From Swiss-Prot:
Record family assignment: Belongs to the coronaviruses 12.7 kDa protein family.
Protein name listed in UniProt: Non-structural protein of 12.7 kDa
Lineage, highest ranks first: Viruses, Riboviria, Orthornavirae, Pisuviricota, Pisoniviricetes
Pfam families for the chain: Corona_NS12-7 (PF04753)
């Protein structure tokens, strides 16, 4: 029996479709409140032979960046979430990102 070949695949801007549905507006509110750049949430279908295909049929991706001054954004971290549907993947991503933003705000406040 031959092993099934899987290949390295990652979410990339070339594959993404942008969305503001499924709670993204809530994420936008948190980004604005805590001075992060406007979020650009995207989603795509996960290829069947990709290493992460067992995580879900769809992947959602978002990169959190600081908004110190226009044109000078700093990368903070990125998020990828998977789901059986676009809605599930994007909703999961929004929840994880909002939780992180709140956690980071608490930690930064504690260290001031």
């Amino acid at each position: 029996m031959r092993p099934t070949a899987t290949w390295i695949w990652h979410v990339s801007d070339a594959w993404l479709r942008r969305t503001r549905d499924f709670g993204v507006i809530r994420l936008e509110d948190f980004c604005f409140q805590f001075n992060y750049s406007q979020p650009r949430v995207g989603y795509c279908r996960v290829p069947l032979k990709a290493w992460c295909s067992n995580q879900g049929k769809f992947a959602a991706q978002f990169t959190l960046k600081s908004c110190e001054k226009p044109g000078h954004e700093k990368f903070i971290t990125s998020f990828t979430a998977y789901g059986r549907t676009v809605q599930q993947a994007v909703s999961k991503l929004v929840e994880e990102a909002v939780d992180f933003i709140l956690f980071r705000a608490t930690q930064l406040e504690r260290n001031v």
